[in-house]
Regions:
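Short, basic/glycine-rich phosphate-binding loops at helix/coil junctions
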Residues: 71, 128-132, 280-285
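Active-site acidic/histidine proton-transfer and metal-coordination neighborhood
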Residues: 20, 66, 83-229
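Active-site-proximal loop/turn and secondary-structure-junction residues that shape catalytic pockets
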Residues: 12-14, 41-43, 77-79, 113-117, ...
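Histidine-acidic metal/acid-base catalytic patches
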Residues: 1-5, 10, 19-30, 105-107, ...
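Short beta-strand segments at enzyme active-site cores
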Residues: 38-39, 72-75, 107-113, 166-169, ...
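Alpha-helix-loop-beta-strand connector modules within alpha/beta enzyme cores
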Residues: 56-73, 147-159, 223, 295-303
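Short secondary-structure transition/capping segments
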Residues: 49-51, 84-86, 121-123, 179-181, ...
Length: 343
């Protein structure tokens, strides 16, 4: 068997609801030789207050139909089934995302793994019942993970009727939130101490299970649906492996039976801090840079060698600033896939 093809992401911030920009980008992607394009449901304004926007969806479909391309869909980056404050809205957004994927003939729908947002804990409704620098306890996090599993199982049935597979994407570390979490834990355990370093510790990635591939695998296993798998984002996993201290290549092997979609891009394995501006991060080699492969340090020869037998889409997820290098990036990806026996 062979891969379905090589794709590229349509950038949500670049499109920002402007379908003329989408049209221009699709024309560019087709000229470059891509087979698939990943459409961000939030970038094309397909959902309005948790419901499909039929007027806009009609216009989107008219644009997509002009091109000899196939499509996958990315849910809103904001979508989070572990957000207790806004759960009904997140669920309805997810249902609308499935409907959108079905409308445009996409078989794959990417969803970022859920997380307990620390800013919600301190600034949202939950903050009214929490002490300063208290932590959401393990029971609360476990309950939100359980609800996400049950909801994904329910949504999987809805998606199956429409020919859609849900692919849960692994996360990269959010160092600013990790530091807040760890500081709160240490204050509770040790009291105020200004001389210890903030670093991953006791409750490592508790609030954000998708950063740990082993926990993501367990979550997807727990859903127990054939059409719920993993989007393995190699860039995210490479950063997370350095930050959390797990073996990057071993994590691919662990997730391999559940991988139904992949995101391919490069970085240096160093997490960003609070300042996530690309103009700052690029020169420092930090953060989720979304560069073409070969620009960073991810060992893609070893990565692709572990994808033999993979039958999905290989999706390049690049920042718009790398547009001049699209054809080069596509050719390099094809070459390396072929050398590794993944074609």
């Amino acid at each position: 068997m062979s891969i379905k093809g090589i794709g590229i992401n349509a950038d949500s911030s670049r499109i920002d609801g402007n379908l003329e920009v989408l049209r221009e980008d699709l024309a560019c992607f087709q000229r470059a030789g891509f087979d698939y394009v990943e459409i961000p449901v939030h970038g094309v304004d397909a959902i309005l207050n948790g419901r499909l926007n039929p007027r806009q969806v009609k216009r989107v479909k008219e644009v997509l139909a002009r091109f000899d391309l196939q499509y996958t869909v990315h849910c809103s980056d904001w979508l989070n089934l572990m957000d207790a404050d806004e759960f009904p809205l997140h669920k309805s957004n997810f249902e609308a995302s499935i409907e959108f994927a079905s409308e445009i003939g996409a078989k794959i729908l990417v969803y970022h793994s859920g997380r307990v947002e620390l800013e919600n804990e301190y600034l949202g409704q939950a903050a009214l019942t929490r002490e300063l620098l208290s932590l959401p306890d393990r029971a609360l996090v476990s309950e939100q993970e359980r609800r996400e599993r049950e909801t994904l199982a329910e949504l999987a049935d809805f998606a199956k009727e429409r020919g859609v597979t849900i692919c849960v994407e692994n996360a990269d570390p959010r160092v600013d939130e990790e530091a807040l979490w760890e500081l709160a834990r240490r204050v509770r355990v040790k009291g105020i101490d200004l001389f210890y370093r903030i670093a991953p510790g006791g409750d490592i990635a508790l609030y954000n299970y998708g950063g740990m591939i082993s926990r993501l695998v367990e979550q997807v296993k727990g859903v127990g649906k054939e059409n719920v798998g993993i989007t393995f984002d190699f860039g995210h996993a490479y950063i997370a492996s350095h930050y959390y201290g797990f073996d990057f290549l071993d994590s691919i092997e662990l997730a391999r039976p559940f991988i139904k979609h992949v995101h391919v891009h490069d970085d240096f394995g160093r997490p960003a801090g609070v300042d996530r501006r690309q103009i700052v991060l690029i020169s420092q080699g930090k953060g989720d840079l979304h560069m073409p492969i070969g620009w960073g340090e991810i060992p893609y020869r070893e990565v692709f060698s572990r994808l033999k037998g993979y039958e999905g889409v290989v999706l390049l997820e690049l920042k718009p600033r790398y547009r001049p290098y699209l054809e080069e990036a596509l050719q390099e990806t094809r070459r390396l896939l072929a050398e590794c026996g993944v074609e």
